[in-house]
């Protein structure tokens, strides 16, 4: 039963790491990356549809994204969604494909994005600590219900803390890597 608590916590830590990785992938770093468009929803025949389901997204050059709609009639809807997004990039529509030229980041923009990365990292750490709290509470419940002894509780709390420390260390590493990517010219 005690192992189940740790396994559940570790699974939730992994989910937090994956979520953070997706979040970091959507923060542009001056290079074209198809994952920048993962969160873009296009109003396609009245239904919000992910852009990657309506078009193929390729990276022909280091700072260019090429969006080729499967249905050419949806090109205006895609362009409208890109203009409405918070990307800050103006799409160039040539009738059959849309080009997004990723501008080089200014020093000021890089620093702003680095702050955003830190903020997102801190939010992920809070999530990890909440998972730890839930696991600790579950362990204490089991001890109260006499399912585990007090010594087992102490050992379990130690294991939970160790897993938490590893999860936080991974978040710190991911954050440092993303900051380095942003601040390198």
UniProtKB/Swiss-Prot annotation:
Pfam families: RRF (PF01765). One of its GO terms (cellular component) is cytoplasm. One of its GO terms (biological process) is translational termination. GO terms for molecular function: ribosomal large subunit binding. It is found in: Cytoplasm. It comes from the Bacteria. Disulfide bonds: none annotated. The keyword Methyltransferase does not apply. The keyword Heme does not apply. Keywords: Cytoplasm, Protein biosynthesis. Belongs to the RRF family. Responsible for the release of ribosomes from messenger RNA at the termination of protein biosynthesis. May increase the efficiency of translation by recycling ribosomes from one round of translation to another. This is Ribosome-recycling factor. It comes from Streptococcus equi subsp. zooepidemicus (strain MGCS10565). The gene is frr.
